[in-house]
């Protein structure tokens, strides 16, 4: 019976970190002060890293090889989906620049998502609907490649925007 108890205690000992061990027999002894939520100041990632560089480069390559601007210029006036998507994208980008430039840089509000909780869901919803509109508008050009091409363009723009702040 003692062997089973010793094995169980040994198993339990290694379930917890070494500094969390407190002898249960000595109730009168003060317990060591340990914080379960240790807050470490992590060093922020550099703004231009391999990941963002890849997406920016991929966006440039896609823009060049699929004649993106020529296609957009040809389909600009023919599709109401494209015009509606452009208007929604303009709203989304305007809200994003309002958050980044005005609230964060000019007013100095770091946590604008806490002070103005409706901004981020509205921006996200308008951007998703704009993406759907662009997919519908450009589907006849690239077919099944349209979502992939637009996603690559989106990630390139996001990574380029993230260089701002």
Swiss-Prot record:
The keyword Acetylation does not apply. GO terms for cellular component: membrane. Keywords: Membrane, Transmembrane, Transmembrane helix. InterPro entries: TMEM128. Pfam families: TMEM128. It is a multi-pass membrane protein. The keyword Transmembrane applies. Disulfide bonds: none annotated. This is Transmembrane protein 128. The gene is TMEM128. Its main location: membrane. It comes from Bos taurus (Bovine). The chain crosses the membrane at residues 49-69, 81-101, 119-139, 144-164.
